[in-house]
Amino acid sequence: MRRTLYRLMIELTNGRFTSYILRKFAQSRLSSIIIPSYAKVFQINQDEMEKGLKEYRTLHELFTRKLKEGKRSIDTDASSIVSPVDGVFADHGPIEDTKTFDIKGKRYSIVDMLGNEERATRYAGGTYMVIYLSPSHYHRIHSPLSGSVTERFVLGRKSYPVNAAGMEYGKEPLSKNYRSVTEVSSDGEHMALVKVGAMFVNSIELLHERDTVQKGEEMAYFTFGSTVVLLFEKDMIEVVQELKSGQELRLGEKIATRLAHK
């Protein structure tokens, strides 16, 4: 019953018009009025911001802010996979041979997440990792490894929340929400970086257009908090043992080891 009511409420409020109004407000000068309150409520670390709080003219500018030079360091070891974002480590685990994985009691299909069977097949038996970005986090997304970009594509239309309630009651938000996917080939092995849109504000802006990418290079940004899913081929990585669900991660921090480089 709770799940049904939750989904009904989301469907009634999560339309194009609502999203349009919220997006327009966030991009308007009027939104600057609530910036101080927003920064206080979400405890934004102002010491790391590229500009002072009063220099951001709109909420959108604050959402998509850059960091001061040198505030994040990228693990440069050739064997390391790094966190592509600042966020909360949600979960990791195996991708079954059926091209599915379980998180928070919900089964997700890689076929649904990536849009077709051919793309999903290469990740069967591999590993998934999920990182959640709250409204307080730095919203820019960077590459977790170096390699060649093999494909970029967008799927989905609406988005359910990706917070705890959304994960429990939503319609498989990680594989059904609006999402932008970048696949990267590195030394013959593939990784998919799935950028999942948040409710109301689906916008994911791609910044990287070249055929190659370097570890730590900026690739895109969210216009609000959301989630990143990383998919790796079978026998490609070993997740850092110390990582725990709920742990805060910082961009550039090592989260896994490339088995081919051990």
UniProtKB/Swiss-Prot annotation:
It holds the Pfam family PS_Dcarbxylase. One of its GO terms (molecular function) is phosphatidylserine decarboxylase activity. Its cofactor is pyruvate. InterPro entries: PS_Dcarbxylase (IPR003817), PSD-B (IPR033177), PSD_type1_pro (IPR033178). The modification Pyruvic acid (Ser) is found at residue 226. Pathway: Phospholipid metabolism; phosphatidylethanolamine biosynthesis; phosphatidylethanolamine from CDP-diacylglycerol: step 2/2. The record marks 225-226 as: Cleavage (non-hydrolytic). It is found in: Cell membrane. It catalyses: a 1,2-diacyl-sn-glycero-3-phospho-L-serine + H(+) = a 1,2-diacyl-sn-glycero-3-phosphoethanolamine + CO2. One of its GO terms (biological process) is phosphatidylethanolamine biosynthetic process. Its EC number is 4.1.1.65. Belongs to the phosphatidylserine decarboxylase family. PSD-B subfamily. Prokaryotic type I sub-subfamily. This is Phosphatidylserine decarboxylase proenzyme.
